[in-house]
Amino acid sequence: MGVFTFEDESTSTIAPARLYKALVKDADAIIPKAVEAIQSIETVEGNGGPGTIKKLTLIEGGETKYVLHKIEAVDEANLRYNYSIVGGVGLPDTIEKISFETKLVEGANGGSIGKVTIKIETKGDAQPNEEEGKAAKARGDAFFKAIENYLSAHPEYN
């Protein structure tokens, strides 16, 4: 098994606490409204805290797929949220799991900076595919921007 680590950062005009609430606390309701590809989010196991497993159903390339999302840590006081993709038909065969450690911090003019560390655990001696990595980054950036756009269009959401 190989472990490959990547870091990324995104900026947003949305305040950190409001963005965190949409991305974490109200994610099951907000994300399917904001992100066109995600059809639904349902809790498969758990109460929303660490250990909870959620099923995200999405449409990618015209196909309906799903991934299993396991919550690893929730730290509302420090605006941190860690989770892993642990299964589903949306996970490449060469990957055991993908872990995300996320944190929101104050950005310019009352906005946010989203920081993420991504750890990809591969099966056997498989290497992450560079094209898959670029595509995953593009999906992550589009996801973050979709949430920002939704919140900008819905100023009543607090």
Curated annotation (Swiss-Prot):
One of its GO terms (molecular function) is abscisic acid binding. Trans-zeatin 3 binds at H69, Y81. One of its GO terms (cellular component) is nucleus. InterPro entries: Bet_v_I/MLP, Bet_v_I_allergen, Plant_def-hormone_signal, START-like_dom_sf. Its main location: cytoplasm. The keyword Iron does not apply. Its EC number is 3.1.27.-. Class II ribonuclease (RNase). Binds to cytokinins. Interacts with melatonin. This is Class 10 plant pathogenesis-related protein 2A. The gene is PR10.2A.
